[in-house]
């Protein structure tokens, strides 16, 4: 029995865990307090690895970022950045239009205050930026972690290849630890679902359904509206034939593999069939799998604003714009690790003074809905890589 269960995919295990958790909560509610330990251990493990994960992934991503391989690379990068920002903005609008409420254990966290004026927010950001790096990691100050990771990453871009390889190896090592933690996700989610449904009842299903609807709806909006607008402006023509071809041949594969990296060969093959210059595609598509993560920006923004709404924190437009930028930067570090976008949510939550403990509960909620969220996110991310690469190549051929 155990051998059969071990052979199942993580998605299947999580689905089974959710069903069992709901069943136990409804049939044996008196047992659920004893199951809370599983959820607490899972959240504690996530809370422990998240700071070093954010630091190493962003540092390695920036240190190994190379520009100048192709004349067409700069406009592709511009599309990547603009696309992620617009995806984050779309997530803000969707979250404001359809606010979601999460079931969180907020006992002893009722002293949270709304951010003050824009000047206060910027002041707090600057103070967080210059925090001691060791202290930032130990206290889970994700803004400080992000600042040091970006600064050191930029400084190390001109270091030797050996140093960069060491950073990549460290990143892979941290990712390996994350994979071990994520492997226990079904057990943790079982405990979390059982306790949550026992405490909140079937109303929890409605909450998760709305959250999923906002997430998936925003990603579809990005794929079918935002991306076509950007591509249409680039190629100066009807973008939808190219958009649908990329979604069909790249997005569907990525949906089931749930890995942008694993989908790189699919994208390279599609780019070749679309007649894209190999010197451009060979760089921009692997690079896109690392830094072009519009779906991750949507996930980080939606879940953060759902947390803000749940805690009753009022935020103004300026703060939301800052959140969109932070979500975009954080998304660049989410590649290559299971649940990467979810594990970078604390970076965005720290903007609003939300504790790491609550942020990790939000990550756990994200894990519960990740069966659909992660697949759709990967489909958007990976199909966008080849879409923008092909669009820029078409534009360059038009100009030649």
UniProtKB/Swiss-Prot annotation:
It is found in: Cell inner membrane. It catalyses: L-serine(in) + Na(+)(in) = L-serine(out) + Na(+)(out); L-threonine(in) + Na(+)(in) = L-threonine(out) + Na(+)(out). One of its GO terms (biological process) is serine transport. Its main location: membrane. The keyword Acetylation does not apply. Coiled coil: none annotated. Gene3D superfamilies: Sodium:dicarboxylate symporter. Keywords: Amino-acid transport, Cell inner membrane, Cell membrane, Membrane, Symport, Transmembrane, Transmembrane helix, Transport. It is a multi-pass membrane protein. One of its GO terms (cellular component) is plasma membrane. It comes from the Bacteria. It holds the Pfam family SDF. One of its GO terms (molecular function) is symporter activity. The chain crosses the membrane at residues 14-34, 48-68, 76-96, 136-156, 177-197, 211-231, 293-313, 334-354. HAMAP family: Ser_Thr_transp_SstT. Involved in the import of serine and threonine into the cell, with the concomitant import of sodium (symport system). Belongs to the dicarboxylate/amino acid:cation symporter (DAACS) (TC 2.A.23) family. This is Serine/threonine transporter SstT. It comes from Acinetobacter baumannii (strain SDF). The gene is sstT.
